[in-house]
Amino acid sequence: MRRPVLACSVLLLALLAAAQAALTPELSRELADAQYVYIQSERKTGDFGKPSEIWFFVDGGKLYVGTRPSSWRVKRIKAGRTRARIAVGSPQGPSFEATGALVKDPKIEEKLMRAYAKKYPDGWARHAASFKDGFRTGERVLVMYTPR
C-alpha cells in the first residue's frame, strides 16, 4: 500500500513543479541587465499584438509592471486573454511566454516604486507621483506576469 501512495505523491509533486514554471538562469540574467521589456498581449484571434516597451521589475520569479487601466494589456487581461509574450531588452531579444493577471497588493506596489526609483533614476522623478497617486486612485494598475 505504501508504494502506490508514494508513487502518487511523487507524481503530484512533479506536476506541481512543472506547473510552477520558472525563468531560466539565462533569462534571469538578461532581465537583471535590461532596462525594458516588450510585452505582446493576446488578441482575440489568439495571435500576439505589437510589442509595447515598458518599465518592469522582477520579484519572486514574477515580472511586474505598473500601467494605466486603459492599456491594451489590461483590457485583454480583463477580457480573459491572459497570455503574453515578453521579450527582454528589445523586441527581438530573448523572450518567454507568461500569464498576466491584475493584482492589488500595496506591498508589491511599494516594491515596484522603490525598484523603479533605483532602476530608472532619470525618468522616475517625473513619474513617481503619478504612480503613487495612480495606484491609490485606480489610474494605475499592477500587472503580474507569471512565466509559463
Regions found by a protein language model. Give the residues of each.
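Boundary at the C-terminal end of the N-terminal hydrophobic targeting segment
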Residues: 17-21
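Extracellular/periplasmic catalytic domains that process cell-envelope and extracellular macromolecules
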Residues: 30-31, 48-50, 57, 78-79, ...
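Short, P/G- and charge-enriched loop/turn segments at secondary-structure junctions
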Residues: 25-27, 42-43, 128-133
